[in-house]
């Protein structure tokens, strides 16, 4: 199958801005999108989009989003670029969490809460600003509020569910609409030694009967996108235990106020917002 890479290099701020635009635009297409540092001295980063067969069509969409002629295109050998696209990313620290691939186990330091997530078919490796913000809020919330159960809605790679389990041995339900993500989530939970605490399920919204067995939740985390978060606000509030906390992300800076208003309308109180690389993570109670 023909594979191509669309790529563009710029300074850190411009590369991150472009990466965020493309990731938001191509969320439903499933194209792997990566940002990697290619010149540490000059702080130059490269944004790559990996596509199969339809490179010209995707290139036209990219031009419409970020301006014509910025991205170059190259043909690639037939290898697993879904995995390869993120191999160059460095480990990420978020609070005491250290999210890393298997090739960076030697970089774990004393005191780290290590989470091993290799790049693959499920979104959410911890290398993304929106995930990092969630991890920081999870650490603070779990350690201060001591929830007795939790929900990771739209779990992706299960990095957030794993983070909760590493802090507290409580029942955690991790759901996603994508069955591939659910399979990957279960594998990652096992790899990180917390499978006994995490139950995974393929579910869209809250329609799955499994929620009747676990709800209400002391802690709900949802790192998805702004529009689904707004639509799900009543259901998320309905499944939150009295006094419980919600941590939301997948939200651009410009979308913060609209998402916050949707949850304040449900009677929730804003606790804190973290800003990371153009994205926000919101804590409400």
UniProtKB/Swiss-Prot annotation:
- For this protein, what is the EC number? 2.1.1.-
InterPro entries assigned to the protein according to its UniProt record, in alphabetical order? Ribosomal_L11_MeTrfase_PrmA, Ribosomal_PrmA_MeTrfase, SAM-dependent_MTases_sf
Protein localization: Cytoplasm
> Which Pfam families does UniProt cross-reference here?
PrmA
Quote the Gene3D superfamilies the UniProt record gives.
Answer: Vaccinia Virus protein VP39 (3.40.50.150)
For the keyword Methyltransferase, the answer is yes
**Reaction(s) catalysed by this chain's protein:** L-lysyl-[protein] + 3 S-adenosyl-L-methionine = N(6),N(6),N(6)-trimethyl-L-lysyl-[protein] + 3 S-adenosyl-L-homocysteine + 3 H(+)
Top-level taxon: Bacteria
User: Which controlled-vocabulary keywords does the entry list?
Assistant: Cytoplasm, Methyltransferase, S-adenosyl-L-methionine, Transferase
- Any one annotated GO CC term: cytoplasm
Residue positions binding S-adenosyl-L-methionine:
131, 154, 176, 223
> Is this entry keyworded S-adenosyl-L-methionine?
yes
Q: Cross-referenced NCBIfam families, in alphabetical order? A: PRK00517.2-1 (NF001784)
- Family the UniProt entry places it in: Belongs to the methyltransferase superfamily. PrmA family.
Family matches, as PANTHER family:
ELECTRON TRANSFER FLAVOPROTEIN BETA SUBUNIT LYSINE METHYLTRANSFERASE (PTHR43648:SF1)
* Summary of the function given for this chain in its UniProt record: Methylates ribosomal protein L11.
Name this protein carries in UniProt? Ribosomal protein L11 methyltransferase
Organism whose genome encodes this protein: Brucella suis (strain ATCC 23445 / NCTC 10510)
Lineage, highest ranks first: Bacteria, Pseudomonadati, Pseudomonadota, Alphaproteobacteria, Hyphomicrobiales
- What gene, per UniProt, encodes this protein? prmA
């Amino acid at each position: 199958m023909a594979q191509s890479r669309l790529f563009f290099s710029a300074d850190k701020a411009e590369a991150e801005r472009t990466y965020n635009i493309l990731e938001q635009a191509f969320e439903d297409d499933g194209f792997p999108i990566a940002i990697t540092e290619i010149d540490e001295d000059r702080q130059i980063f490269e944004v790559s989009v990996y596509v199969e067969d339809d490179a010209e069509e995707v290139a036209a969409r990219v031009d419409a989003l970020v301006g014509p002629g910025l991205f170059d295109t190259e043909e690639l050998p037939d290898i697993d670029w879904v995995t390869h696209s993120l191999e160059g990313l460095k480990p990420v620290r978020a609070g005491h969490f250290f999210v890393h691939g298997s090739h960076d186990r030697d970089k774990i330091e004393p005191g780290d809460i290590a989470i091993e997530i290799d790049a693959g078919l499920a979104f959410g490796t911890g290398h993304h600003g929106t995930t990092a913000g969630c991890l920081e809020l999870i650490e603070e919330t779990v350690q201060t509020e001591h929830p007795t159960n939790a929900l990771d809605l739209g779990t992706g790679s299960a990095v957030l569910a794993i983070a909760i389990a590493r802090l507290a041995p409580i029942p955690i339900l991790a759901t996603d609409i994508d069955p591939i993500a659910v399979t990957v989530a279960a594998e990652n939970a096992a790899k990180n030694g917390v499978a006994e605490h995490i139950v995974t399920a393929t579910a869209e919204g809250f329609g799955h009967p499994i929620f009747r067995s676990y709800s209400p939740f002391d802690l709900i985390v949802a790192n998805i996108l702004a529009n689904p978060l707004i639509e799900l606000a009543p259901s998320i509030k309905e499944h939150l235990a009295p006094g419980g906390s919600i941590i939301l992300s997948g939200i651009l800076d410009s979308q913060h106020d609209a998402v916050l208003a949707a949850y304040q309308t449900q009677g929730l109180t804003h606790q804190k917002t973290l800003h990371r690389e153009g994205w926000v993570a919101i804590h409400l109670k």
